[in-house]
Each structure stands twice: as C-alpha cells, then as structure tokens.
Amino acid sequence: MMGDLLTGAGVPNAVIDLDWLRRSWPSPAGDRFNVTMALRNLRSVAGNYREAGAVRIVLAGVIETRIERDRHQDALGVPLAMCRLRVDLPLVRARLAQRHEREGEVLQWHLARSGELDTILEAAAIEDFTVDATDLSISSIAKTVLSTVGWQGLFPSS
C-alpha cells in the first residue's frame, strides 16, 4: 500500500520485504533469524534501487535492537526513519489463528512469537514513532506512516 501511494503520487520508490531477504536455510549459529544474510542482500538490493532512481525506499520487517537498526541503516545507505505498527495482542493472535488455522505447529510458533516480539519491541523502544493500527484500515495506516515520516503533501486529504 505504501508503495502504491508513493507511485500514485509520482514518487520513484521501492518496497523491500526484509523477511524475503533473509529467507534461506539453515541460519548460521547465533543468528536465529538470519539477519546477516538479510543485511547482505539489503545492501545490494537497496543500492540497485537507488541506482535505478528510487528516491524513497520502504522496508517492511522487524528490527529488534539498536544495533540491528544501525546495521540496517548502514546497509540501506540512507538515513532510516523507523515506525512501529502497534496492534493489540489479542487482535494479532486472532488474525494469526485465521491465517494459520490448518497449520497447528506453525500457528503455535507464531502465537508464542507474537508475545515474545511485543515484549522485545516494547523494551527496545528503537522506533522513531508508533502508529496504533488496531482500528485503522491498511490505507489509513500507510497514509499515517508516510505523513509522519515527513512525506506529507504527497496525498490529498481524505
């Protein structure tokens, strides 16, 4: 949605899903979520997008620590503005139950991880701002994030 809004406003952009940049197996010992691979790929992919003319790059994913944040900014090659999308945990878990209703083990992992991640992100507090997305539409979330980052004026008021 953020990429669509930027494109609709005529802003050259790229959207990068960090999960796909880390998706390989096995992860090295001590790197549970293969962050090192994600960073290597981010450096290349972001550089390619910038060379192709992207002036806004949106990253979608989880960054858990200040060190990881700094490493992502370094790999991105431009200053990073970080938003935490906050959704009430019971709603997160209800959505996970729908998404993984026929995947028992996968569902249990995601349910446990959602609580773990909520605690980690709350304690780390490495975001520049937080958007409570519990009751917002996807479009409203995207517009709020883009406006808060300072890219206001790109979209007509709605």
Walk through the language-model features, giving the residues of each.
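A structural preference for long, well-packed, hydrophobic secondary-structure segments
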Residues: M1-T7, W25, A29-G30, A52, ...
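Conserved substrate/cofactor phosphate-moiety recognition/catalytic segment
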Residues: G3-G47
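Conserved nucleotide-binding/hydrolysis micro-motifs of P-loop NTPases
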Residues: W20-L21, I63-T65, R86-L91, S137
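Short, hinge-like loop/turn segments at secondary-structure boundaries
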Residues: D31-V35, A75-G77, R99-E103
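Glycine-rich phosphate-binding loop used to anchor ATP phosphates in small-molecule kinases
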Residues: M37-L80
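Conserved phosphate-donor/acceptor-positioning beta-strand/loop module used by diverse small-molecule
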Residues: L76-A97, V131
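Small-molecule kinase domains that catalyze NTP-dependent phosphoryl transfer to phosphate-bearing small molecules
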Residues: E101-T144, W151, P156-S158
